[in-house]
Amino acid sequence: MIYWQNRILTNVKNALGSKCPNVSSTVNNTKAKFPACAVRIVSDSAISDDLESLDEEAAVLCGVAVDIYSKTSLGHAIELMDIANKSMYAMGFKRQEGPMQIEDESSPELYHLTSRYVRVIGSEDIIEKLTFEAP
């Protein structure tokens, strides 16, 4: 199984740095500290099998959702999403949709943006640990 959740999460977290220290791979109902970012694998479908070993994947189409939450302003959420977007592109992902603003009537003071990214990841591919200048 080809799975890169931890490296993708770490790279986005390092890119956001002190501007958004609350980065996780889960979305839950616990009281969050803002700003916050959720980085989740939303699809990881096999698109090619290893011809030598029929029980192994040769490549997957990896879909990642990035959600940014801010209580400061929509502009602040956009600024954070731009940083996350650059880190996703640096890992070879392409934005499939977004950023879209998600409005929640129960939390009108919360600015929420979401984007989705895709990339083919082969069994021999390596997603490098990225280094970033402090924002």
Identify the meaning behind each predicted range.
Residues A32-A36, A59-G63, I83:
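Short connector loops at helix/strand junctions that flank enzyme active sites
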Residues M1-S53:
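Small/polar-rich, solvent-exposed N-terminal microdomains that initiate assembly or binding
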Residues M1-T10, S45-S53, E57-L61, R95-P135:
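Short, charged interaction patches at domain edges and termini
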Residues R40, A65-Y69, R116-V120:
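Residue-level recognition of well-ordered beta-strand positions that form the cores
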Residues K86-G98:
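Short beta-strand and beta-hairpin "edge-sheet" elements
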Residues A65-Y89:
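Mid-chain, well-packed structural core segment of small domains
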